[in-house]
Each structure stands twice: as structure tokens, then as C-alpha cells.
Amino acid sequence: MADVSNSEPAIVSPWLTVIGIGEDGVAGLGDEAKRLIAEAPVVYGGHRHLELAASLITGEAHNWLSPLERSVVEIVARRGSPVVVLASGDPFFFGVGVTLARRIASAEIRTLPAPSSISLAASRLGWALQDATLVSVHGRPLDLVRPHLHPGARVLTLTSDGAGPRDLAELLVSSGFGQSRLTVLEALGGAGERVTTQIAARFMLGLVHPLNVCAIEVAADEGARILPLAAGRDDALFEHDGQITKREVRALTLSALAPRKGELLWDIGGGSGSIGIEWMLADPTMQAITIEVEPERAARIGRNATMFGVPGLTVVEGEAPAALAGLPQPDAIFIGGGGSEDGVMEAAIEALKSGGRLVANAVTTDMEAVLLDHHARLGGSLIRIDIARAGPIGGMTGWKPAMPVTQWSWTKG
């Protein structure tokens, strides 16, 4: 979807009014909202919204088209003429207001929000909203909840439909959080409002209203899969065949990659996908593309991404540099495998954005020679990582060294 266009002449006064409406319908609207709906020649909204406000609508009522972009195009075409859009609760909280604001300047939009379902849920529960974690799985994978499952955490989850609470309970149980308290808050603010609390492992709720929020008070079972917040998570948390950047090296690698909000990483030679996964865990806005030539490993990366709660990780099955063609330009690149192949380093350097970071690791002398050459020509930082782990030697304990890793880090000027 295109962003707000600067080519259109400015319109100072708002012509588009976005009104939040709750389950209490017209009764919950203020006088100004009621007047604007009644006077609007055109009103857009979902079927439920239009039904809730039917007693006020005198103009044309337009149901959202599928895909939504078709309706947005229609609304933009009416620029300068009064249009009202009805939305759930707060239109700028995971709502249609965000979509519209990408195409229409904020000065042209008047917004009259209602309380969001999340705000209503927090008030019903007596939770401090600023201390809770908010996760939307509305039209998105339920696995996005996984990184937030820490004992004692309070998580408010926007679901897609009436099956969401049951599916969430099953995810909690399968991840080792079956003793968590799961509260389902249905049709908040409406006549059919219902609030039910159960233990996830004993979840028995039958028919659930499609408009619901799930509140989780996280409690871990013995052996629960708790994902640490710091980079360099235990290798055992990943499914792998031995091709994995070990946790200590991974922590140093991610430090060198220096993730920043909203950035895109290319992980060339994905192995288990651990670098791309931990990059995405740094912030919900992060993106990563992992390139892996082996089909079995590519499938394994996808499974790891799901289990770590970053199902948005893109896996490209193919061999660099050919597999890099056509990919979106990255802010950072990690080369953990295949860097000594012809053209890989050159293609990565060429693709990287100005100011972007490239980090490459070597465990073979062939790849080390490539890194030494690039360091000599381009500069950057070159370090050697030596890790030794204590282990039994006869009846005593000694140090067992791992293969040394040479790491080259470089920022493109």
C-alpha cells in the first residue's frame, strides 16, 4: 500500500471522520459522533459496525470490500467530500485507522475513538495496562505469543475468532505453561459480555463469542520452554544437526550485527536459523531472511522459527549468490556458511545498504583467508574467538577447546 502522497494539494479541514464504536452501539457514542454519522452522505464499516449504527445512518452504507485495499481506494477517491468510517474501539490500536493514515494525511482525518477492547479488558481485570504485554494474533500466527511466556508475566492477547481461546490454551499446555490462568473476556461493553477464568490445562469453555480478548497470567510447569531475553540462547533450545552458531559465538555475532528497530537481516548459510531467529527476537519490528541450500535444513529453520515465536522469518531455499537476486535490500548481513564460494562476499557487500553492517564468521582456513583479504582491503574489525569448555579428563577435569572462530565485522560507508 502506498504512503501518503505529497503530490495532492493540501486540504486543511478534515473530510474523513473515523469513529470508534463499541459493543454497546449507539448508546456508547457521544453527541458529536452521532451527529457526524447522521449527517454523513457516505459511511464505511464492517457489517457489524453498520448494524450497530443503523439507526443513525441516513447516507449510503458501504460494507468493507475484500481485500480492504479496494475500499481504501474508494475512500481516497472521495477526498474532500465528507466520509465517515466506523471501526472497533480505538481505530488506531491495531485498527483500520492505521491503514487509512498510510494513505491520507493526518490533518485530513478527524478521529473519535472509543475504549479499545484491550483497555476494557484491563479495567475488568484490574490490571495496570502499562505493565501488561500486548500481543495481537488477529489474522496472525498464534506462535507470536511464545516469546512472551515468562513466569509471572501478564499477557493480553487479541484473538481472531471464537476458536482463539481454545487454541491458545493448547499452545500454553504444549509449551509447558498449562498451569497458567487464562481469562477469556467476550463481547466487552455489550449485552453479551462474559468474563471466564480457567486454568489452561483444564480449559473447558465451549462456544466463545468471536470478539474476545484472552488474558494470560503465566505460570510455568516443570520443564517449560522459557525463552531467555538475552542473545546467545542455549543451543539445546534449537533443533539442529550440528550446523549451528554456538551460543557464545552467536552472542558476539549479534552484538556485532547491532540490531536496530525495524531493520532487515540477511542470514546467508542459515544452518539452524539461530542468528536470524535471535535477530527477530530483539524487537517485534525486526525482519530476517535466511538463505539455506539444504532442503532439510531449510525446513528445520522454519520449525525453529515457529517454536521461538518468530514465524515471520523468511526462509529462501537456494545457494548464494544466485539466491540473493531480487531480495529486499538488507540493513545487515551475516555470513555463517558458504562465504568462501565465488561471488558470495562480493554480492553481499554490493547489496548492503550504506551504513549497513556485515559480519562473517570463519572456522575453516579457506574462509579465514577470505576474511583476512577483505579486512586488509576494506578495514573493519577482525577478532578471533577461542572457547574452551570444562570436561572430564580421566578422573579429573580439564579444558576442551572448541574450534576457533575468526570474525570480520565491517560497516559500509
Curated annotation (Swiss-Prot):
This is Precorrin-6Y C(5,15)-methyltransferase [decarboxylating]. The keyword Transferase applies. It is an enzyme of class 2 (transferase). It catalyses: precorrin-6B + 2 S-adenosyl-L-methionine = precorrin-8X + 2 S-adenosyl-L-homocysteine + CO2 + 3 H(+). GO terms for molecular function: precorrin-6Y C5,15-methyltransferase (decarboxylating) activity; protein methyltransferase activity. Pathway: Cofactor biosynthesis; adenosylcobalamin biosynthesis; cob(II)yrinate a,c-diamide from precorrin-2 (aerobic route): step 7/10. Its EC number is 2.1.1.132. Keywords: Cobalamin biosynthesis, Methyltransferase, S-adenosyl-L-methionine, Transferase. It holds the Pfam family TP_methylase. Belongs to the precorrin methyltransferase family. It comes from the Bacteria. InterPro entries: 4pyrrol_Mease (IPR000878), 4pyrrol_Methylase_sf (IPR035996), 4pyrrole_Mease_sub1 (IPR014777), 4pyrrole_Mease_sub2 (IPR014776), CbiE (IPR012818), Cbl_synth_CobL (IPR006365), Cbl_synth_MTase_CbiT (IPR014008), Cobalamin_biosynth_MTase (IPR050714). NCBIfam families: CbiE, CbiT. GO terms for biological process: cobalamin biosynthetic process; methylation.
